[in-house]
């Protein structure tokens, strides 16, 4: 997932992507909610702008690499559907 963000940053001309991953507790101790926030920092702005948010749960049966692959697909889906067209 980090590699795809780096690759996208190599072709963006009007900004840089920043990825924030935040695990949060749930009511069930063995389950974590993982929040993913994708920001863009443009050359004209001093603060990043959130452009994509998605989340998933990590349960004892899940593998973190599966979650990473899923998150990568979410980012690619966003890009393919034109989510970054203003920053190319």
For the regions a protein language model found, what residue spans apply to each?
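Acidic, low-complexity, intrinsically disordered interaction modules
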Residues: 26-66
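Detector for Asparagine
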Residues: 3, 9-10, 35, 62, ...
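Negatively charged, low-complexity tracts enriched in Asp/Glu with abundant Ser/Thr
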Residues: 1-22
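Generic short amphipathic/hydrophobic targeting helices enriched at N-termini
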Residues: 1-7, 27, 47, 59-60, ...
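Intrinsically disordered, low-complexity regions of eukaryotic proteins
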Residues: 18, 24, 46-47, 52, ...
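Mixed-charge, Lys/Arg-enriched low-complexity segments
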Residues: 53-88
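Extended low-polarity, hydrophobic cluster-rich segments
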Residues: 17-23, 34-38, 71, 75-80
């Amino acid at each position: 997932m980090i590699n795809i963000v780096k690759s996208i940053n190599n072709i963006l001309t009007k900004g840089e992507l920043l990825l924030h991953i935040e695990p949060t507790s749930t009511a069930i101790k063995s389950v974590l909610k993982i929040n993913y926030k994708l920001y863009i920092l443009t050359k004209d702005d001093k603060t990043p702008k959130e452009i994509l948010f998605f989340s998933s749960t990590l349960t004892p049966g899940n593998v973190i690499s599966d979650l990473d692959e899923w998150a990568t697909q979410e980012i690619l889906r966003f890009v393919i559907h034109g989510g970054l067209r203003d920053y190319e």
